């Protein structure tokens, strides 16, 4: 909590007396005295706000019982409200008094009274206060009855002006001056969570003028971002996209907020990840290439920092899937070329990967996989010596579309041909060991081919036992370069779940495989992915078996 200055209490009484004196007299001396003390009074209001914003409304009224009186006198002093800075601070203080969830009629009444003061300040921002008072009286309303409606009307009027609506029946457009836009956005900072103000917030965010510089305050963008991320305000997607376009820190904060939800707690299931990603509105916003590039760069950084952690890879792949879905909903034909989203990759490779692998009929999947493998291999191995950007960029593009890896494993294990296609071997080795040089990758492909042949021979030779399968997966000690352990486990688990012979021994095999927490987490991830694919990608899988195994393993870690 902010510390109360030692002399703030005495200052409080001093300014309350001053406001009463200014209220009772309207002489030139009083006006001169007000102007003389205005800067000091504004500083006092700032100090009060720093204190009030750390307290709830009940605590404020207990500590400062006459705070409403002080702020009301301030609101009705035209010399004080003549300064935009005073308007802004007074509104901030008033918002601190608002009870966000009133439980009694007294609290609701206090909120209505504060709303009246807020509408009065906004009316002072728009019109001469004497005109407002005369207009109110001519309608036969008391101010306390009129102001709640005035606030809504003021918001609607400002929204209409911002949107260039026709005024007074004249076919002309009215645009606010940049200085007034800035002032209005600052006034709205503490109001962004109030339902009556939401249309104005949306109009400000989607306002597009011709000014070369931003006309809204950074504090306004920050306040809207904070309210949106804490779910205190609901905004249409167009307003959120505009917010992120106009204020880069807001986009970065939203992306970090998503990362925190995805990665900071215990492992999220993939379906929960998908819900979080969609609710963030980032995939919809990323249909704009400029936003996508920033979010993608942040994914890249996390991927590098975590050394390709499975949870980060899964989140990136789900995000990409949600993006592709959003692009298809927005327009059947891409508004932007795919190269705009992935500028460091060959357009033909991007186009091939962006196809829906799950939509390819069974029996027609090998050729697209081999085509992708060839394009990736050309991109990776044709780069000049000493250049590491192309291999990483190609791998980073590839991991966005993880569905192709699933298909490659299926094709490798379920095909009847004696020899595994070299293109599939290269694709899997590259996915799991992207840092390898060409010669190392070739050696890994040889070992992977031997391993796949051993597993398939064992599968076709008769009754399958768990121990025989696990022994066949172990690399001989004399192997110069054993296959990546993660890839070996992926092949084993796929074989166990995708073949009838594997179903009979899957419990025993998985029990022996899960000998460390790290491997257990890896198996949990595979099972979760199996359930996710069966639900979303129309891939047949043993759902019941995977669900039972997943529940059992999750209880162990």
From Swiss-Prot:
Organism taxonomic ancestry: Eukaryota, Metazoa, Chordata, Craniata, Vertebrata
Native source species: Rattus norvegicus (Rat)
Keywords from the UniProt entry: Cytoplasm, DNA damage, DNA repair, Nucleus
Residue ranges that the Swiss-Prot or TrEMBL entry lists as coiled coil: none
A GO-annotated cellular component: Fanconi anaemia nuclear complex
Name of encoding gene: Fancc
UniProt-listed InterPro entries: FANCC
Predominant subcellular localization, coarse grouping: nucleus
Name of this protein: Fanconi anemia group C protein homolog
Described purpose of this protein according to its UniProt entry: DNA repair protein that may operate in a postreplication repair or a cell cycle checkpoint function. May be implicated in interstrand DNA cross-link repair and in the maintenance of normal chromosome stability. Upon IFNG induction, may facilitate STAT1 activation by recruiting STAT1 to IFNGR1.
């Amino acid at each position: 909590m902010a510390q109360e200055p030692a002399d703030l209490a005495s200052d409080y009484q001093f300014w309350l007396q001053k406001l009463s004196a200014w209220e009772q007299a309207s002489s030139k001396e009083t006006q001169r005295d007000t102007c003389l003390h205005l800067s000091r009074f504004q500083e006092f209001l700032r100090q009060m706000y720093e204190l009030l914003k750390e307290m709830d409304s009940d605590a404020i009224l207990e500590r400062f019982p006459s705070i409403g009186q002080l702020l009301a006198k301030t609101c009705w002093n035209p010399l004080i409200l003549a300064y935009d800075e005073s308007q802004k601070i007074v509104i901030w203080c008033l918002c601190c008094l608002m009870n966000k969830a009133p439980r009694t009629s007294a609290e609701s009444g206090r909120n209505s009274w504060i709303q009246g003061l807020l509408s009065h300040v906004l009316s002072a921002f728009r019109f001469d206060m004497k005109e407002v008072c005369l207009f109110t009286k001519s309608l036969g309303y008391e101010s306390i009855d009129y102001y709640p409606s005035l606030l809504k009307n003021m918001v609607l009027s400002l929204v209409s002006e911002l949107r260039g609506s026709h005024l007074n029946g004249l076919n002309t457009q009215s645009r606010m001056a940049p200085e007034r836009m800035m002032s209005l956005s600052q006034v709205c900072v503490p109001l962004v969570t109030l339902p009556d103000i939401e249309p104005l917030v949306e109009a400000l965010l989607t306002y597009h003028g011709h000014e070369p510089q931003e006309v809204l305050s950074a504090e306004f963008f920050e306040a809207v971002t904070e309210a949106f991320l804490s779910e205190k305000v609901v905004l249409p997607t167009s307003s959120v996209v505009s917010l992120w376009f106009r204020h880069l820190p807001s986009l970065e904060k939203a992306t970090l907020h998503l990362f925190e939800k995805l990665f900071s707690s215990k492992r999220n299931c993939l379906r929960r990840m998908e819900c979080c990603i969609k609710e963030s509105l980032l995939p919809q916003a990323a249909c704009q290439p400029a936003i996508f590039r920033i979010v993608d760069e942040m994914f890249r950084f996390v991927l590098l920092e975590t050394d390709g952690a499975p949870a980060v890879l899964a989140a990136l792949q789900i995000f990409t899937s949600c993006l592709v879905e959003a692009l298809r909903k927005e327009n059947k034909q891409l508004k932007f070329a795919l190269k705009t989203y992935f500028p460091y990759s060959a357009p033909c490779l991007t186009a091939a990967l962006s196809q829906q692998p799950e939509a390819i009929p069974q029996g027609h999947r090998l050729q697209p996989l081999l085509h992708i493998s060839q394009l990736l291999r050309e991109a990776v191995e044709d780069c000049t010596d000493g250049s590491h950007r192309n291999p990483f960029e190609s791998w980073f593009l590839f991991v966005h579309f993880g569905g192709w890896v699933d298909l490659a494993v299926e094709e490798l294990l379920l095909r009847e041909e004696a020899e595994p296609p070299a293109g599939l071997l290269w694709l899997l080795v590259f996915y799991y060991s992207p840092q390898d040089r060409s010669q190392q990758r070739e050696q890994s492909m040889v070992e992977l081919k031997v391993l796949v042949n051993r597993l398939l021979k064992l599968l076709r030779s008769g009754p399958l036992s768990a121990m025989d399968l696990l022994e066949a997966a172990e690399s001989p000690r004399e192997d110069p370069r054993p296959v990546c352990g993660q890839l070996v486990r992926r092949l084993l688990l796929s074989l166990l779940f995708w073949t009838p012979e594997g179903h009979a021994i899957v419990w025993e095999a998985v029990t022996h495989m899960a000998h460390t927490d790290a491997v257990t987490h890896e198996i949990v991830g595979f099972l979760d992915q199996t359930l996710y694919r069966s639900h979303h990608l129309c891939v047949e899988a043993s759902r019941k078996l995977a669900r039972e195994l997943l529940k059992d393993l999750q209880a162990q870690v």
